[in-house]
């Protein structure tokens, strides 16, 4: 069995297990208890100074989740970086860079390969025009970012809630429509840490009725109302001519007689498919493993007139000649929308003395 298929089968098993407290989850519960104790001890070591957290010379904002898999961190990180730039800050972004080939800090340049720096950091760099650096050691990466870009006055860590060695000033925890799953810790459930874990802000990617979260959290909605040909997106997205864009209403009319395939190699493909259905499109679905590398062309034998992919997948597809030149492939960029009051709270915290 191919490795990607094995991974996909294992992912499906755990998705089913983590959705409810069934037999498989109960059998794994003792391991969750051990995991919970070890995780709590680690947090306490940093809280009481037994293990030392490294503080940067600028404030650090961590955007992350405790639910395994994708919850929409990248759109939120992009929104946050753009919001801070508009407020007069000079943000820089650090990330682990899933799939990155180097363990040492590495700058994400416009011509970087996704397999070298990771798909999400490459997308963040394209969308925000902020300095982005990746590496396994968040402290070393943050230090390298500040050394290379001394104008940076706030660091955004894309993921890394559990990387306690990097001291942080603001924590933003993100959930999506899956809520807490069955509410148990790994491996019986999908949670890396308890929901009661301390944080500054809780954001839900989706509607309140889709989650079991409390009502006082901050709502985030993703909108993708445009589609653009992959062949026209070799430049940074902000440089793509507006004539290359088509609204979903136009796409729906123009594509309705055709066979449409929607493909997504993200943590929660159903979120992408639901977004397209809400736009009135009818299509076949191709869920791919998270961070699918697109080294091979999964669409070569597909009988479809139009193939819709996520923006995160597009940064990898552009680096495959067959995919980049396939006129059937269209990209659906998404934009995060959050309440202005949330942006004001973040800016106020950064400008105040509470995180000095």
From Swiss-Prot:
Which source organism? Herminiimonas arsenicoxydans
Q: Which residues bind ATP?
A: 67-74
Q: Which reaction does it catalyse?
A: a lipid A disaccharide + ATP = a lipid IVA + ADP + H(+)
What is the protein's given name?
Tetraacyldisaccharide 4'-kinase
Query: What InterPro entries would the database entry show?
Result: LpxK (IPR003758), P-loop_NTPase (IPR027417)
Arranged from A to Z, the UniProt key words for this protein are: ATP-binding, Kinase, Lipid A biosynthesis, Lipid biosynthesis, Lipid metabolism, Nucleotide-binding, Transferase
This protein's pathway reads: Glycolipid biosynthesis; lipid IV(A) biosynthesis; lipid IV(A) from (3R)-3-hydroxytetradecanoyl-[acyl-carrier-protein] and UDP-N-acetyl-alpha-D-glucosamine: step 6/6
| Gene Ontology molecular-function annotations | ATP binding; tetraacyldisaccharide 4'-kinase activity
Function summary: Transfers the gamma-phosphate of ATP to the 4'-position of a tetraacyldisaccharide 1-phosphate intermediate (termed DS-1-P) to form tetraacyldisaccharide 1,4'-bis-phosphate (lipid IVA).
| E.C. designation(s) | 2.7.1.130
Entry similarity comment: Belongs to the LpxK family.
Q: Lipid biosynthesis: present as a keyword of the record? A: yes
Q: Which PANTHER family match?
A: TETRAACYLDISACCHARIDE 4'-KINASE (PTHR42724), TETRAACYLDISACCHARIDE 4'-KINASE, MITOCHONDRIAL-RELATED (PTHR42724:SF1)
- Mention one GO biological process in which this protein takes part, according to its record: lipopolysaccharide core region biosynthetic process
For this protein's source organism, the top of the classification is: Bacteria, Pseudomonadati, Pseudomonadota, Betaproteobacteria, Burkholderiales
Q: Name one GO cellular component term.
A: plasma membrane
